[in-house]
Each structure stands twice: as C-alpha cells, then as structure tokens.
C-alpha cells in the first residue's frame, strides 16, 4: 500500500508541475492589451459597443425564459431544462488570453449558452403544444423536431400528441 501511495503522490506532483509549467507557457503567449488594440481592425473596436449592448436583451431573455419555465413547466409536468448544461462560462480562465479576449469569451459563452438554453426550452414547449413539422424543410431544427408528426398528418397528430407529451414529463 505504501508503494501505491508514493506513486500516487509522485503522479500528483507531476501533474501539478505540468499544470504550472503549462500556465507559465500560456502567460508568455498572452498578448498585451495595447498590442492587441494596435493590431485590431478599427471596425472591430468601433463595433464593440453595439455588440456588447446586446448583453441587456440577452440577460432579460435569460431571466424571462427562466421564469417562464419555472412557472409553466411544472403546470404541464414538463421536465425543466438545466441552465448550467447550456450556459458555460469558463474560457476566461485561460492564461493565454488578455483581459479584452477574456471579456469577449465571457460574452460569447454566455450569449450562445443562453440561446441554446432558450432553444431547448422552446423546443420542449413546441413538443408539448404543437409537435408538427413544417411544410418546408428547416435548416437546423431543435433536438425534438425529428419526433414531430408530418405536416398534414391529422390522424398521426391525434395519435402521437399524448405520446410526445408523456416523453417530456419529469
């Protein structure tokens, strides 16, 4: 047992040393903010306020859709969507990113995560209320769409609606 413990300790030390050296290497690769700004296209800098202004409606959408599912999903016995499965903000921890790049990564991780979260909530809502495919093909349907009934299949709709609703239950 002692030999196994020593080996585990050595492996732990090696992992710690590796992570420390990797972090140092990443820090050396980080571009300074002044250099980053000098090398940025002027339109990137000028458009930043407009891009970042979207955080307000995105945050409101996040809050509103979360409240919607907290209130409505239990009423219809639809399993709630776990927000943390969609909204992941972790890239700011990367040592090779400067402050501006970290803020950009936080924004994009949050915004795209919220949209994916909203898409899953609205996909479950559509499955409950109207699980019918559209007459024309969608470019990128949500994950529930393939289970929907064909457009114009009235008998299939009546038959499949209870089955699809049961599939959403907690």
Language-model features: locations:
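Membrane-proximal intrinsically disordered regions of secretory-pathway and membrane-system proteins
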Residues: 1-40, 87, 93, 106, ...
């Amino acid at each position: 047992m002692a030999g196994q413990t020593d080996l585990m300790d050595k492996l732990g030390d090696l992992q710690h040393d590796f992570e420390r050296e990797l972090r140092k290497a990443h820090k050396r690769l980080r571009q300074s903010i002044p250099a980053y700004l000098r090398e940025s296209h002027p339109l990137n800098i000028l458009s930043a306020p407009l891009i970042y202004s979207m955080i307000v409606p995105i945050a409101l959408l996040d809050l509103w859709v979360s409240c919607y599912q907290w209130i409505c999903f239990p009423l219809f016995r639809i399993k709630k969507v776990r927000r943390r499965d969609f909204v992941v903000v972790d890239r700011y921890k990367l040592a090779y990113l400067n402050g501006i790049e970290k803020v950009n990564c936080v924004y994009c991780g949050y915004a795209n995560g919220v949209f994916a979260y909203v898409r899953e909530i609205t996909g479950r809502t559509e499955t409950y209320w109207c699980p019918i495919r559209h007459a024309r093909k969608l470019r990128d349907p949500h994950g529930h769409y393939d289970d929907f009934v064909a457009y114009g299949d009235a008998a299939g709709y009546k038959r499949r609606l209870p089955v699809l609703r049961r599939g959403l239950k907690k």
